[in-house]
């Protein structure tokens, strides 16, 4: 059973990593450009939704991999690391999916509203897009900390203890 979990987790990790790489290569960038230019670029982006869809599938596969690797830790003294690592993996993956969904729908939609706003509405449309942008960034920072930081750290501690 343990061998099957490890193999499935390894395949999920490999495919998820390849999809994450592809999704990030396709994803439009904001860079250090002024916010209004970024919103205009995202309003016209044809690759944002495709990239986010690819990244959602990647995160699902990587979450499966993290949970499987965590569950492969055996021994009573390692159970806490396995459970915490799996929990942080699921929590981080869930936040990531929410962030990609928000970005793909609300961020792009509000950028389009800003782009098409008439003169009297430009300021409020900008600040609405800016608010969605800040929520999107907050979710991104949170899931990267939990999914790419805490989950592998806890699982790594368990693996180091098992060696």
Name every feature range the model reports, one short phrase each.
Residues 1-163:
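Hydrophobic, aromatic-enriched alpha-helical segments typical of multi-pass transmembrane helices
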């Amino acid at each position: 059973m343990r061998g099957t979990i490890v193999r499935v987790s390894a395949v999920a990790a490999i495919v998820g990593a390849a999809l994450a790489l592809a999704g990030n290569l396709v994803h439009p960038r904001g860079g250090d450009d002024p916010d209004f230019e970024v919103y205009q670029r995202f309003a016209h982006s044809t690759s944002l939704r495709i990239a986010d869809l690819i990244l959602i599938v990647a995160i699902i596969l990587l979450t499966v991999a993290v949970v499987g690797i965590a569950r492969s830790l055996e021994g009573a003294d390692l159970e806490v690391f396995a459970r915490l690592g799996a929990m942080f993996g699921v929590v981080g993956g869930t936040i990531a999916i929410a962030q990609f969904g928000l970005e793909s729908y609300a961020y792009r939609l509000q950028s389009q509203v800003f782009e098409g706003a008439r003169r009297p509405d430009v300021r409020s449309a900008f600040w609405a897009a800016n608010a969605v942008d800040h929520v999107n960034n907050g979710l991104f920072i949170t899931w990267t900390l939990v999914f790419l930081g805490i989950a592998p750290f806890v699982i790594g501690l368990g693996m180091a203890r098992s060696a």
